Amino acid sequence: MEKYLIAFLLGVVCLEVQATPVVVKKIIDGDTFIGDVILADGIEVVSVAVRVLNVDTPEIHGECEDEIRKALYAKQRLGELIPEGTTIEIKNIKNDKYAGRIDANVFDGAGRDVGLVLVKEKVGRSYSGGKRQPWCVLD
């Protein structure tokens, strides 16, 4: 089912200007949430994990206390930007490297690009793939 959902989403939103509505169900961490994607004029709803495109936030199961603290704040901040139960929009949907998850530009209720907000507020870093930079400072 997940393969079909991702294929459908990629086909439906091949134009960058088209937005797909999503109801936020659960914040997972600072750059990932579970959302109910509304398909077919609001008739069908499918749950999917969405990773905010172009941003990297610290990991909750991080390598040091500082990373874990920052990760918990990033999760809280994402929840403030896109509260559970609200309807937001996603654009530029792409397959994620992990099965069952998609990457997308995420826009809050005010139309702000959530990834850009997280980077601007220094809650996350710009990320375009590849090796992630560490969040822990080595002595």
Please name every model-derived segment.
Residues 4-13:
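Sec-dependent N-terminal signal peptides
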Residues 15-139:
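Small beta-barrel nucleic-acid-binding modules, primarily SNase/OB-fold domains
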